[in-house]
Every structure is written in structure tokens, then in C-alpha cells.
Amino acid sequence: MTRGIVVKTKDKVKIAANYNKKGHKKVLIIAPGWCMTKDSKAFRQIARAFSSSYDTICLDFRGHGASGGFYTFSAKEEKDIEAVVDFAKKKNYDEICLMGFSLGAAASSIYASKYKVDKLVLVSAPYDFDKIENQMYKKEAWLETFRKFELIRFLTIRPSLFIHKKTKPADIIDKITCPTFFIAGKKDPTVHLWHTKELYNAAKCKKALKIYENGIHAEDLYLHHKKDFITSCLKWLNGDIN
């Protein structure tokens, strides 16, 4: 059963999320990237795909969807994850796992470097926000953006007009202690493959790396490789990948 929930961050921003409670003992928190929401078709599919094994909570970051505030491109979004994790803690799950996509992966890595989660999946995570390539002129970028475009979703996006100091995932990745699964596409035009490789090499936790040879960016890795993506992630989350 999926229901909408609203939690509040420590800086008083309301964060909306879809909570799919199936009675599992573990929960997977899903953190979309920039311009993606809990109600984006791709993320509804992702949450549904994992719900056979996990309760899921997919959030709207600040400045997205039904959440309040303005998006700060990973400067403050860890607070949004913190509020959702705190909600999950009250449900007494055996494990709280976190999966982030693109800038959602950046926020997830920052959160996990400070606070406890049981397992972490980072999909197309940037090494440094200022080094994101974002080559929108490439067919792999604009064509997929066009295919996923949802006007209702797009109209909810509210970026901050101010420049905020951002923590670089590169500077904190070695502080993550939970098992972490890095996933990337070799042909990613937005966050090039080297970002994930550098983060993986710098991580000191138990870790694994999966590269899709023909894969591109973030949720597109799921959309183009659905069965393998879900199977690989579940193997990692269940402790079956060393």
C-alpha cells in the first residue's frame, strides 16, 4: 500500500514522499536526481520494482514536486534525506538502506558520511558538482530527457536563486563506513564515468562497482536495463555480492 507522507527537515522545509509499506523488515529510501520526483514515471517504476523485497520511501527533494523550499543542488539536500531516515527509524526496521541517483547520489553520499545507514547504492554519482559535464547537446542526453519529459513534473521544479557552498562527494567518500554499491554508465553524457571510478577508488568501505558498457545516466540505467539493474541491486542489498 502506497501512501503520501510529509516530514519536516531541521531547517523547517516540508518534504513529501511516497511510502510503500508492504510489511517487510527492511526499507529502501530512494533519492531521485535533479528534475526528477517521487511521482516521475521512472521512479514510480523503480519503487514498485523493489517493493517485492523492501518497503520503499521515494522522496521529493526540496524544490521538487510536493515538497517545499528551493533546490540547492546538493548543498542542503542531505537534510531532506535525514528527515526521511528519521521517519523510517521510528518504524523499527531491521535495516535502512539508501539509493541515490545523480545529485540524489551526491546528497546520499554526504548523508552517509555523517550518519548511519545499513547499505548504500550510488547511481551516477558526481565526484564534484563543479566538474559535472552535462553535455546536453549529445543525443544520449537530449533524447532521453525528451522521452522522460512530464510537464506536470517540470512545472514543480524550483531551483534556488542563490549560490550555496556544496560539499564535494570526493572529500567525504572515504568517511562512509557502510557497504556501498557504485553504478555508472560508460556513455553517460551528464556525469562522465570517471566520477564514479574516482569515488569507488577513494572509498574505504566494503564496496562493489558495476559499469554498464552502453549505459547512460542515472534512472536511464534502470530504464534500459530493468531486470539486470534490479537484480544486481537486490544482490548487493541482500549481501550476495562481495
Q: Residue locations for each model-derived region?
A:
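The serine-hydrolase catalytic nucleophile loop
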Residues: 34-48
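Catalytic nucleophile-loop/oxyanion-hole region of alpha/beta-hydrolase
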Residues: 64-91
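Short beta-strand/loop motif that positions the catalytic acidic residue
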Residues: 176-177, 182-184, 188
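Catalytic histidine-centered segment of alpha/beta-hydrolase-like enzymes
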Residues: 69, 215-227
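Hydrolase active-site cap/lid region
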Residues: 115-162
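N-terminal cap/lid segment of alpha/beta-hydrolase-fold proteins
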Residues: 1-22
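Conserved alpha/beta-hydrolase "acid-adjacent" motif
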Residues: 189-195
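Conserved alpha/beta-hydrolase
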Residues: 47-68
